[in-house]
Amino acid sequence: MSKVLVATTGTEFDAQAIDEALKLLGSGHEYLILTVLQGEVPAIVGDGGGIAPVMHIPPETWIEQEKQDHVLAERRIRKTLSELGSDVEIRVESGDPGERICAVAVEEGVDLVVVGSHDVGTLRRVLGGSVSDDVAHHAPCPVLLIRHRDV
């Protein structure tokens, strides 16, 4: 039985990526569903290309919000996987999604990483890249990209 890491980032595309992975791979695998929530304040790029200042938010507020985000992400994933008969582990972590996904793939010795992919636009790809690009280039094993389809 192979070990498959299905990586999600707490977006609305998660259920679709998980569904597609299960359709393609079937139930004869051990699944690790990893959701990585980016636990930092994103910078805002203004119209002129400058970075807008981000207002200060107390750490306690961020910590509480992050806890709530973890609970909601796990609840959504459990709902999506309720009919699956395979061995499933769910983990929710914080940090840089690309880095954490690749690190967990190494730690767990997975055979395949499945990650959703959608068009983030050329500017964003140049400035910050995308999670799927990062994982595709740095994962220690094969990567299956599930392209987001418009619904």
Residue ranges: model-predicted function:
Residues S2, D111, P140:
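Conserved acidic residues
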Residues S2-I57, S86:
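Small/aliphatic-rich secondary-structure junction motif
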Residues F13, K79-V113, D150-V151:
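Structural beta-alpha unit
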Residues L32-L34, E89-E93, L144:
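General small-molecule cofactor/ligand-binding pocket signal
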Residues V54-L72:
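A short acidic, glycine-rich active-site loop
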Residues L112-H138, H148-V151:
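Glycine-rich, Arg-bearing micro-motifs that act as flexible, cationic patches
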